[in-house]
Regions:
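C-terminal recognition in membrane/secretory proteostasis and scaffolding
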Residues: 1-211
Length: 211
């Protein structure tokens, strides 16, 4: 229109998604989740969180990953069951205060970076309703210099591969365990080969949560 300039305004006051709680510190009740930042899908910008809430959810179905496509967990949210408040959204996860009763589960020791080894490990995640199950992976590379892609792994568990095709969206934050200790959390999937994923060190998340 000649010399007339037009501008557009994009406004969004809330965002909802499915991810996995990585840890709760039983002493401070600080939690960490996702292992990466929340991005606004239309702008690809990191979301600046003023207030946020984690709710109970219930996995209803899985869209399987395949080469060139990252699948997803599909969930029903129970907005009347609040578990905690999100305080910050960072490049290494979301963090906040867990305000519900901490589940009576066995606590895990935290592994240092030096304790993590190439070889077999497990991830814990939910694929059906609210049932946490453990699945086999193989760690094939450890990079202490990377910001978030510290642990490279391949899913070897047949049941998990049959159900998901590999790493799916919503699996971010799933704890990674080795030799009875928590070592990290799932962060990313390789789109060209969804059986391969990345995780970051749990010590990075714990340090960020305490800031």
């Amino acid at each position: 229109d000649g010399d007339i300039y037009k501008t557009g305004l994009y406004v969004k006051d809330s965002i909802t998604g499915t991810g996995t709680l990585s840890y709760i510190d039983p002493e401070t009740k600080i939690f960490g989740a996702l292992g990466h930042e929340i991005i606004e899908s239309n702008t690809s910008n990191i979301v600046e969180i003023k207030t946020g809430t984690i709710f109970r959810n219930y996995i209803t179905s899985i869209d399987k990953s395949r080469v060139g496509y990252a699948g997803s967990k599909n969930a029903k949210f129970y907005y009347n069951t609040k578990y905690g408040s999100i305080m910050k959204n960072t490049g290494v996860g979301i963090y906040g205060l867990y305000e519900s009763t901490i589940p009576n589960k066995e606590m895990l020791e935290v592994a240092t970076k030096e304790e993590i080894k190439i070889g077999s490990a497990k991830i814990a995640t939910v694929l059906n309703k609210e049932e946490v199950k453990y699945y086999d992976i193989e760690i094939n590379k450890i990079d202490e210099t990377a910001k978030i892609k510290n642990i490279s792994f391949k899913i070897t568990d047949k049941e998990l591969l049959d159900k998901t095709g590999g790493v799916v969206q919503g699996m971010s934050g799933s704890p990674i365990m080795q030799n009875g200790k928590i070592i990290g959390a799932v962060t990313h999937v390789i789109i060209d080969n969804p059986t391969i994923g990345y995780g970051l060190f749990i010590t990075t998340m714990l340090d960020e949560g305490e800031k």
